[in-house]
Amino acid sequence: MHPAHLLVLLAVCVSLLGSSEIPQPSLDFEQFSNMIQCTIPCGESCLAYMDYGCYCGPGGSGTPIDDLDRCCKTHDECYAEAGKLSACKSVLSEPNNDTYSYECNEGQLTCNDDNDECKAFICNCDRTAVTCFAGAPYNDLNYNIGMIEHCK
């Protein structure tokens, strides 16, 4: 393929990605990871939640493959709902510029009352997802499964 054609193809792909309705990541991925650590002490293996099943990680499609994947689908849907709140428009457009406030006490997560409407909503999306993760078994066979083949 001619290099100019590759550039056009790349531009189209980037354009399509930019216009798709992929839910934004947590306000602060590190915060979400810390929430996971609070509830499920997993060390470096917490990253395994970022490429699991059809919904854990960027994007998501098809039918969730198990309970843990359903937790991630619900989390994606929660973020989509947050995107509909007028209070969240500026926060979600630049998600790493702000963080929500929460506490971890003996494995229990609480979103603090000092969060504004959007941060409270997103904190609860993340808290609910992490609580769901804690109750769902992790199946090593569903890590990095290849979305194209398995998530239609």
Curated annotation (Swiss-Prot):
Contains 0.9% fucose, 2.2% mannose, 4.2% N-acetyl-D-glucosamine, 3.5% galactose, and 3.8% N-acetyl-neuraminic acid (sialic acid). GO terms for molecular function: calcium ion binding; calcium-dependent phospholipase A2 activity; phospholipid binding; signaling receptor binding. Residues 1-19 form the signal peptide. Glycans are attached at N97. SMART domains: PA2c. It is found in: Secreted. Keywords: Disulfide bond, Glycoprotein, Secreted, Sialic acid, Signal. GO terms for biological process: arachidonate secretion; fatty acid biosynthetic process; lipid catabolic process; phospholipid metabolic process; positive regulation of fibroblast proliferation. PROSITE patterns: PA2_ASP, PA2_HIS. GO terms for cellular component: extracellular region. Expressed by the venom gland. InterPro entries: PLipase_A2, PLipase_A2_Asp_AS, PLipase_A2_dom, PLipase_A2_dom_sf, PLipase_A2_His_AS. Disulfide bonds join C38-C104, C42-C46, C54-C151, C56-C72, C71-C132, C78-C125, C88-C118, C111-C123. Its main location: secreted. Heterotrimer of alpha, beta, and gamma chains; non-covalently linked. Heterotrimer: Snake venom phospholipase A2 (PLA2) heterotrimer that acts as a potent presynaptic neurotoxin by blocking synaptic transmission and synaptic vesicle recycling. May act by binding in a calcium-dependent fashion to neurotonal pentraxin-1 (NPTX1) and neurotonal pentraxin-2 (NPTX2), but not to neuronal pentraxin receptor (NPTXR). Also binds to taipoxin-associated calcium binding protein 49 (RCN2), a protein localized in the lumen of endoplasmic reticulum. Monomer (gamma chain): Snake venom phospholipase A2 homolog that is neither toxic nor enzymatically active. Does not bind calcium. Belongs to the phospholipase A2 family. Group I subfamily. D49 sub-subfamily. This is Acidic phospholipase A2 homolog taipoxin gamma chain. The lineage of its organism: Eukaryota, Metazoa, Chordata, Craniata, Vertebrata.
